[in-house]
């Protein structure tokens, strides 16, 4: 069951006109939870999900039964499993080919050669668990808050190409053509904002305009 997010509840109730904190798969789960359609006004940047470790410098060093902390919310749990699969640490069942469409859970792991122990933890708490696990899959924003540099510190990062997890500016269908929303979307997609993201985060946050088609 998906938990309702207060930021989206505020938007649904008309207390705010837009929000900017989530990716599309998460928004879809919120539409289902709230019974409320939303509208995407702009895709702005990607905060790549990363795999981190204080115990190991390479995936080859992982022992049998290694512990892996992953986010416990539905969309980012699935995202973490796809990332682990991309580094051949697990293999999901056939049919799980589209991260934006096919939500995976640990029950959907078909092959787990290292017998990894998947530990579901609230996303903001995962950086604190780094000392206690072999690997931690951490959202980009929480990694940055914890003083990690994703582009340098992660053993593995999500690729930007064809990534469905861009952070988006979200509004309501009623407001999607409002000139103020359209101007905000234009500003967030401007070369100046893209340059600021690139200059400030050095590859740890990627402006959508930098993605390959």
What are these regions (language model features)?
Residues 1-3:
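Short, small-residue-biased leader/transition segments that mark boundaries at the very start
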Residues 5-19, 32, 82-83, 104-137, ...:
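Short helices/loops that flank or line small-molecule/ion binding pockets
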Residues 16-19, 37-43:
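Short beta-strand-centered segments that line the small-molecule binding cleft or hinge
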Residues 29-41, 56, 132, 137, ...:
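Ligand-binding "clamshell"
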Residues 41-91, 194:
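A conserved helix-loop-strand patch within extracytoplasmic ligand-binding domains
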Residues 42-53, 78-85, 144-186, 188-213:
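Periplasmic-binding protein-like
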Residues 90-111:
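Short mixed-charge
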């Amino acid at each position: 069951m998906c938990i309702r997010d207060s930021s989206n509840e505020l938007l649904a109730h008309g207390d705010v006109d837009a929000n900017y904190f989530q990716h599309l798969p998460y928004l879809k789960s919120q539409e289902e939870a709230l019974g409320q359609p939303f509208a995407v006004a702009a895709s702005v940047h990607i905060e790549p999900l990363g795999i981190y470790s204080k115990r190991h410098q390479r995936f080859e060093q992982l022992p049998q039964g290694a512990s892996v902390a992953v986010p416990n919310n539905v969309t980012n749990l699935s995202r973490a499993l796809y990332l682990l699969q991309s580094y051949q640490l697990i293999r999901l069942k056939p049919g799980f080919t589209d991260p934006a469409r096919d939500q995976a859970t640990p029950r959907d792991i078909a092959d787990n050669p290292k017998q990894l122990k998947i530990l579901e933890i609230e996303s903001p708490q995962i950086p604190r668990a780094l000392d206690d696990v072999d690997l931690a899959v951490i959202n980009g924003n929480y990694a940055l808050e914890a003083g990690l540099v994703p582009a340098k510190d992660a053993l593995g990062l999500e690729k930007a190409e064809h990534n469905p997890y861009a952070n988006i500016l979200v509004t309501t269908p009623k407001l999607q053509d409002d000139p103020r929303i359209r101007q905000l979307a234009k500003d967030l997609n401007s070369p100046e904002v893209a340059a600021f993201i690139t200059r400030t985060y050095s590859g740890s946050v990627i402006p959508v305009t930098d993605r390959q088609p």
